[in-house]
Amino acid sequence: MENSKIHFSYPLDKSDFKLIEPYTYICESSGKGFRNALIKSFDYWLKVGDEKVQDISKVIQGLHGASLLIDDIEDNSKLRRGKPVAHSIYGIPQTINSANFVYFLIMDQCNKLGDPKATTIFIEELIRLHRGQGYDIFWRDTNTSPSEQEYMNMVNEKTGGLFRLGLRLLQAFSDNNTNYIDLVEDLGMYYQIRDDLINLVSVDYQQNKSFCEDISEGKFSFPIIHAINADSNDNRLLRILKQKTEDRSVKEHALEYIKSKGSLEYTEKKLNVLKEKIIKQINDLGGNPILMKLMESLENSSI
């Protein structure tokens, strides 16, 4: 069924919309819109204007929605924003095809933004995003704990990908050539590490996803990596991650172990260091009240 909120520049037949129903379904449960708000905040500096901001926001929103369809399959997730994941309704084959279909529809939109660099930027960041996702999956599926630095490098590739893409597309249409990459990558790092913490401690997250979902997925998140590295002679957390358990009592034991190693406090300290670094960069770049307000709202949400 065609959704009035779903628009692509490529001319789709009315019947084509049944092919992207998994994508339409996931778009019905919109997130907090942080990435779109981030693009708008950078336009405070870049002065591109509302029309181009909206066009680029549609690219980021479309790419993000399609990537979530694939992520949920790769992570064997059950819920997304409190609703059944798309592939549990439409099946894995159609969901994969729908996501890939949307990737190319979004690439077509990039091609029509009006700057030849836009498509190149899109491809470069999609390569980096998939590289990061690949490492994340490799570590999980081989039960191999990365170092903290390896994890942060992966986050720069994966989570930083959509953040950088939005900034780079916006800057392609701006006369402002100031380098904001370090700032946007630090924002991506803050966003991901904070999400890692929320996954383990947030009541809201547990209601919309599940209790300690990263443990059930066998995922190596920032606090989990710290807890593993805190005692190389104790392999219990690695063993639990390898099981990809749904057993709440086992996950509660894992969480208590993570707490006992001071990993949640360590993660909070890392977030505070990142926050101060981000604020300093914003001020050094001339200030940005919209971005500062966005940081404040991010800091105070979902925990």
Swiss-Prot record:
Subcellular location, record wording: Cytoplasm
Organism for this UniProt entry: Dictyostelium discoideum (Social amoeba)
Record's GO cellular component terms: cytoplasm
BP GO annotations: farnesyl diphosphate biosynthetic process; geranyl diphosphate biosynthetic process; geranylgeranyl diphosphate biosynthetic process; isoprenoid biosynthetic process
Residues binding dimethylallyl diphosphate: 80, 158-159, 192, 209, 219
Role played: Catalyzes the trans-addition of the three molecules of IPP onto DMAPP to form geranylgeranyl pyrophosphate, an important precursor of carotenoids and geranylated proteins.
Chain ranges passing through the membrane: none
EC id: 2.5.1.-, 2.5.1.1, 2.5.1.29, 2.5.1.10
PROSITE patterns: POLYPRENYL_SYNTHASE_1, POLYPRENYL_SYNTHASE_2
Cross-referenced InterPro entries: Isoprenoid_synthase_dom_sf, Polyprenyl_synt, Polyprenyl_synt_CS
Subunit structure: Homooligomer.
Main location: cytoplasm
Pfam family, one: polyprenyl_synt
Gene name linked to the record: ggps1
Pathway involvement of the protein, from the record: Isoprenoid biosynthesis; farnesyl diphosphate biosynthesis; farnesyl diphosphate from geranyl diphosphate and isopentenyl diphosphate: step 1/1; Isoprenoid biosynthesis; geranyl diphosphate biosynthesis; geranyl diphosphate from dimethylallyl diphosphate and isopentenyl diphosphate: step 1/1; Isoprenoid biosynthesis; geranylgeranyl diphosphate biosynthesis; geranylgeranyl diphosphate from farnesyl diphosphate and isopentenyl diphosphate: step 1/1
Domain of life: Eukaryota
Official protein name in the record: Geranylgeranyl pyrophosphate synthase
Cofactors named for this entry: Mg(2+)
